[in-house]
């Protein structure tokens, strides 16, 4: 049980996909202007990452390895991600049309989010079992969502703050992201993996 807790804390805080591994920067910068949109994108990405991790592990373990088709791993995982994203898009469209309109083009872009593919590939490379794969996918998504929501809240505050003209817009957003990354580096001694 301790191993699973360490995996969760380590993935969310210490090895955060956005601030440490620099995966998923496109939605991090693009969807984080409003808190509601960032929360919606975080929830959708959490669902997709967790389900993709589970499906990718199952396909790799039950199909690719037994048939010696490991060279098709990346292609198979991209296909799994596309199917899961389409399923998520249908669910969001039916359950929350407002969120569907808010996310706009960013929902289909989860397919090309490198963090989702990165989670699937890292699960296999790290040799995780089924439960560890599911937890790793969920933890990576929670870390992604946490950082997105924090960044969106900060950006909303910066929108009304008195920022010098050269730093307005993306410049202050990048500086803020760098400061957040430095803050998350403080967690690096928390978990030794």
Curated annotation (Swiss-Prot):
Enzyme Commission number(s) of this protein: 7.-.-.-
Primary location recorded for the protein, binned into one broad class: membrane
Pfam families, per database record: Rnf-Nqr
Record's subcellular location: Cell inner membrane
Segments crossing the lipid bilayer: 5-25, 39-59, 63-83, 102-122, 134-154, 171-191
Enzyme class per UniProt: translocase
Membrane topology: Multi-pass membrane protein
Keywords: Cell inner membrane, Cell membrane, Electron transport, Membrane, Translocase, Transmembrane, Transmembrane helix, Transport
Cellular component aspect of the GO annotation: plasma membrane
Highest taxon listed in the record's lineage: Bacteria
Family: Belongs to the NqrDE/RnfAE family.
Subunit structure as annotated in this protein's UniProt entry: The complex is composed of six subunits: RsxA, RsxB, RsxC, RsxD, RsxE and RsxG.
Protein name: Ion-translocating oxidoreductase complex subunit A
Organismal lineage: Bacteria, Pseudomonadati, Pseudomonadota, Gammaproteobacteria, Enterobacterales
Gene: rsxA
